[in-house]
Amino acid sequence: MPIETVILREATADDVPFLRAMIWEAILASPTLLNQRGVDAIQQHEEQYWSGWQQHPDPAFVALDTNGRLLGAITLQPNEPSASVQGWRIGMGVEAEVRGQGVGRHLVGRAIEFAKVAGAAYVNLFVDPANTHAIALYQHAGFVAVGTRDALIEMRFNL
């Protein structure tokens, strides 16, 4: 049953622990990625990314319920390091107990809206082929599979 009211807001520095936890949840749901790169290498990459986030934050949004409980998060990283970003790569995680209740749909919609306003040409993501629920969510939002990288499916939403 969908959560009736999902509140979305920009993430702040205070949200970094939650953002990290949600992205780590998404990584753990990706056995293909874990097997290919190894937990240690992924942890090292994540540590470097989040330590730099405080000084140069990428866009990120959190979803809350009406009581202020954090439900999920989505991050956007530029696909190319330039002033005119053509594509944003998203990473998303939703608390286990509220998956399938519309939180992810709201977060993905907000990321697409952000990218449109920013003038990007597309939004993309990488998803484990075994994560069929996530694939269905992204397809429902209008993403299409465009290839693979490191055995993960690349999905894209053209703006």
Regions found by a protein language model. Give the residues of each.
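Conserved GNAT acetyl-CoA-binding A-motif
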Residues: 108, 115-126
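Glycine-rich acyl-CoA binding loop
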Residues: 100-105
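Conserved N-terminal entry element of GNAT/NAT acetyltransferase domains
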Residues: 1-17, 21, 159
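C-terminal "cap" of GNAT-fold acetyltransferases
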Residues: 3, 25, 121-135, 139-159
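Short, solvent-exposed beta-strand edge segments and adjacent coil->beta transition regions
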Residues: 3-6, 87-89, 120
